[in-house]
């Protein structure tokens, strides 16, 4: 059963009680009668990024890691959802409540948690804090879980260029921030290295401090339609929940979409469009969350930069669509590019 702890601007004490009462797998009434042994169980928590659980992408990948830890490690999990338009102070309050409730580790899903984690980690030095997609804030009890997104995106560019009939492809970024620029840079380089004459249409949905580009599917849908109208027949979106709108528009037009973060061909919420999801650039967010939880449980908590790239299968390109697996020339080109990146023959740019 899905149990989400929602913390917005409630007081710290009441928030902590709410978290304790809604740990994954327990109703509030069950939690109220917890035994002493329950209170000593290892607990772990994740605080979701914009879009929350159900985004069919980034947040859901993190949740899958927590689920795996619950099943394989016997960990008691807790979750906390973001609120629209929240401040860093709201994030501090959420993370504080999670730490005060005894969760260890506490994981912030997304770079937006960096300032809050830096502050709360100092207040709870015995708790390990994980942050995904950020290295700007460090500390002895902070694990920076990061990925070479540009490498996976390069492979997507190769696949897009090899698949396109119009020699025009599209990239849609949710919000124009350095992280998403990495996706763009790798994708464009992969396209151009494969087909120098190809045209890459690039659009960002919003600019900071407006982060709706990660959460509004209608924005992604409109952007994709604009690129389709300009002749794009393969569109890659790095836009969280907003990317689902781009996938919908692309699929309805009978063109190819490329997903991100999770294998979006396999996501139930996108089942109606999966035949047009050529592939997805995957990040092993699930594995990074699970590994951090396991390290804490084993008494050897990770800290510092924990980077995952093509060489460690931390990023990659999904091959779930049977139509894609039949494209032997595309797969051969992707595999060659992967080998060349791992061997150091290709250096992928991190900025456009």
Language-model-detected regions and their locations in the chain:
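A residue-level marker of the well-folded mature domains of exported/periplasmic proteins
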Residues: 3-6, 24-26, 32-352
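N-terminal export and membrane-targeting signals
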Residues: 1-14
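C-terminal motif of bacterial Sec signal peptides marking the signal peptidase cleavage site
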Residues: 19-23
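Intrinsically disordered, low-complexity segments
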Residues: 12, 18, 31-37
């Amino acid at each position: 059963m899905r149990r989400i702890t929602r913390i917005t601007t409630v007081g710290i004490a009441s928030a902590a009680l709410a978290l304790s009462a809604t740990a994954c797998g327990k109703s509030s009434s069950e939690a109220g009668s917890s035994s002493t042994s329950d209170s000593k169980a290892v607990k772990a928590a994740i605080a979701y990024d914009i879009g929350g659980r159900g985004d069919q992408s980034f947040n859901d990948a993190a949740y899958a890691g927590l689920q795996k830890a619950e099943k394989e490690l016997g960990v008691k999990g807790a979750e906390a959802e973001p609120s629209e338009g929240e401040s860093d102070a709201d994030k501090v309050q959420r993370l504080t409540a999670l730490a005060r409730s005894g969760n260890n580790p506490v994981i912030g899903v997304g770079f937006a948690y960096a300032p809050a984690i830096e502050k709360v980690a100092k207040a709870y030095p015995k708790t390990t804090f994980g942050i995904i997609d950020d290295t700007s804030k460090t500390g002895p009890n902070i694990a920076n879980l990061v990925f070479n997104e540009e490498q996976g995106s390069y492979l997507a560019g190769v696949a897009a260029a090899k698949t396109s009939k119009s020699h025009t492809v599209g990239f849609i970024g949710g919000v124009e921030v350095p992280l998403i620029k990495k996706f763009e840079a790798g994708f464009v380089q992969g396209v151009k290295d494969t087909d120098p004459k190809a045209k890459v249409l690039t659009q960002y949905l919003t600019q900071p401090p407006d982060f709706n580009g990660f959460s509004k599917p209608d924005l992604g849908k409109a952007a994709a339609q604009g690129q389709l109208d300009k002749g794009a027949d393969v569109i890659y979106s790095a836009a969280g929940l907003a990317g689902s709108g781009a996938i919908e528009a692309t699929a309805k037009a009978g063109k190819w979409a490329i997903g991100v973060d999770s294998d979006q061909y396999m996501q139930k919420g996108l089942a109606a469009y999966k035949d047009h999801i050529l592939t997805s650039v995957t990040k092993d967010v699930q594995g990074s969350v699970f590994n951090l939880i396991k390290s804490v449980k084993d008494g050897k908590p990770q800290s510092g930069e924990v980077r995952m790239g093509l060489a460690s299968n931390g990023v990659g390109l999904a091959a779930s669509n049977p139509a894609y697996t039949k494209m032997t020339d595309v797969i051969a080109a992707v595999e060659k590019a992967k080998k060349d990146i791992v061997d150091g023959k290709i250096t992928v740019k991190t900025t456009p």
